[in-house]
From Swiss-Prot:
Example of a GO biological process term: tRNA threonylcarbamoyladenosine modification
Gene label: cgi121
InterPro entries per UniProt: CGI121/TPRKB (IPR013926), CGI121/TPRKB_sf (IPR036504)
Entry's family note: Belongs to the CGI121/TPRKB family.
Listed Pfam families: CGI-121
Provenance organism: Aspergillus clavatus (strain ATCC 1007 / CBS 513.65 / DSM 816 / NCTC 3887 / NRRL 1 / QM 1276 / 107)
Function noted in UniProt: Component of the EKC/KEOPS complex that is required for the formation of a threonylcarbamoyl group on adenosine at position 37 (t(6)A37) in tRNAs that read codons beginning with adenine. The complex is probably involved in the transfer of the threonylcarbamoyl moiety of threonylcarbamoyl-AMP (TC-AMP) to the N6 group of A37. Cgi121 acts as an allosteric effector that regulates the t(6)A activity of the complex. The EKC/KEOPS complex also promotes both telomere uncapping and telomere elongation. The complex is required for efficient recruitment of transcriptional coactivators.
Subunit description: Component of the EKC/KEOPS complex composed of at least bud32, cgi121, gon7, kae1 and pcc1; the whole complex dimerizes.
Location of this chain's protein in the cell: Nucleus; Chromosome, Telomere
Keyword Lipid biosynthesis: no
GO cellular component: chromosome, telomeric region; cytosol; EKC/KEOPS complex; nucleus
Stated name of the protein: EKC/KEOPS complex subunit cgi121
Domain of life the protein comes from: Eukaryota
């Protein structure tokens, strides 16, 4: 089993929609996983996110909340809640661009995997078992420490057009995190 798979109940969302999150390093089969997504294999309906584009837990949890909330309110702009999570990470309204920047590629080595329990048969154990069988990589804890080792701050700042924002001090890192969360919340607002 994936010892590091974390199941989270997001506040302000129904209790029957827990979210399962796994973080993997040194993934060797990204092309296979990406192909499963592209072919529409329902067994691989996950949000496969390039972890180098994730700054913190709060950053990705904000995108998950937005996607699940949009799903519950009939406002999905993509195929399903899992693709919407990847789309929600993007500050732009272009779905294809969001997948290029934030989604899994054939070269992805560090992978964040998210699964929302949209049906009762999706449980912590079923997700952990499937990921253990499917992902060739090292499962690591989904922590801010792990994400800070993986995240490419320069790429993240470029994607969000925040190049001038410093990240030298803890206050600067907090300001960047709040800017990322704000971009997620405001994308598409008119």
């Amino acid at each position: 089993m994936s010892a590091s798979l974390e199941t989270i109940q997001l506040p302000h969302l129904p209790s029957n929609l827990p979210v399962h999150i796994g973080l993997y390093r040194d993934v060797n089969n990204a092309p296979f996983l990406r192909q499963q997504l592209l072919s529409g294999n329902a067994d691989f309906e996950y949000a496969f996110i390039d972890a180098s584009m994730v700054f913190s837990r709060a950053h990705v949890l904000s995108a998950i909340f937005r996607a699940v909330n949009d799903s519950l309110n009939g406002r999905l702009k993509s195929r399903n809640v899992h693709s919407e999570i990847v789309f929600s990470l993007s500050p732009a309204n272009n779905i294809a661009e969001s997948f290029r920047k934030f989604g899994i590629t054939d070269l992805t080595k560090d992978l964040l995997v998210v699964k929302v329990s949209v049906t009762p048969d999706i449980t912590h154990n079923s997700v952990a078992e499937h990921l253990q069988q499917s992902i060739e990589g090292l499962s690591v804890p989904f922590t801010d420490t792990s994400l800070s080792e993986i995240g490419d701050v320069a790429k993240i700042k470029k994607a969000y057009k925040l190049g001038s924002l410093s990240t030298a001090q803890d206050d600067d890192k907090r300001r960047l995190e709040l800017s990322l969360i704000g971009a997620i919340a405001l994308r598409g607002a008119t």
